[in-house]
Design a protein with these regions (language model features):
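Register position in tetratricopeptide repeats
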Residues: 92, 126-127, 157-158
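Residue-level recognition of tetratricopeptide repeat
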Residues: 79, 113, 145-148
Length: 158
C-alpha cells in the first residue's frame, strides 16, 4: 500500500512538473531561433564541404538548411540574419530569383547588414550584374571586414 501511495505521489508531482514546464514555454521556440541556429550550422558545414569540392554533399546540406531556415522565417519574418542565410541557401541551391528577394527583404530591415550586402553582391556577380555588385561593395566600403575583401576579390576576378 505504501508503495502505491508513493507511486501516486510521484506520478502527481511528475504531471504537475510537466504541466508547469509546458505552461512556462520552456523548450518551445516561439522566435524560430533554434531553427535558425540549426540552419546556420548546416550552412557552415556545407561551406566546408564545398571547399573540399564535395559539391553534392554540400548541396544536400544546403537543402536541409533551407528547410530549417524557411521554418524559422515563418516564425520571425523581421530577422535580417534569417533572411541572410535563407538567401544564401537559396543561392547555393540555384534559386537566384528567390534568393535575391530574401536578400532585398533583409536589407529593408538592416541596410548595413554585412552578410547580406556581401552575398547579394556575390549573387549579382553570378548573374552578370557587376554594376549592382559594385553598389553592394560600396555599401561595405570602410567596414574593414572580410565581407568587403571577399566581394572585392570576386568582382575583380570577373
Amino acid at each position: 500500500m505504501k508503495l502505491v501511495i508513493t507511486f501516486l505521489v510521484f506520478l502527481a508531482l511528475s504531471v504537475n512538473l510537466n504541466l508547469a514546464f509546458a505552461a512556462s514555454g520552456a523548450g518551445l521556440d516561439s522566435t524560430g531561433s533554434s531553427l535558425y541556429k540549426s540552419g546556420k550550422k548546416l550552412i557552415i558545414k556545407a561551406k566546408k564541404l564545398e571547399k573540399k569540392e564535395k559539391i553534392e554533399k554540400a548541396k544536400t546540406l544546403y537543402l536541409k538548411a533551407l528547410d530549417k531556415l524557411e521554418k524559422a522565417y515563418d516564425k520571425d519574418k523581421k530577422n535580417a540574419d534569417i533572411l541572410n542565410y535563407l538567401g544564401f541557401a537559396l543561392r547555393k541551391t540555384g534559386d537566384f530569383k528567390k534568393a535575391e528577394k530574401f536578400y532585398l527583404e533583409g536589407l529593408k530591415i538592416d541596410a548595413g547588414h554585412l552578410g547580406i550586402n556581401e552575398y547579394l553582391g556575390e549573387l549579382y556577380v553570378q548573374t552578370n550584374r557587376i554594376d549592382l555588385a559594385k553598389e553592394r561593395l560600396q555599401v561595405l566600403n570602410g567596414c574593414k571586414c572580410e565581407e568587403y575583401d571577399e566581394l572585392k576579390e570576386l568582382i575583380e576576378k570577373n
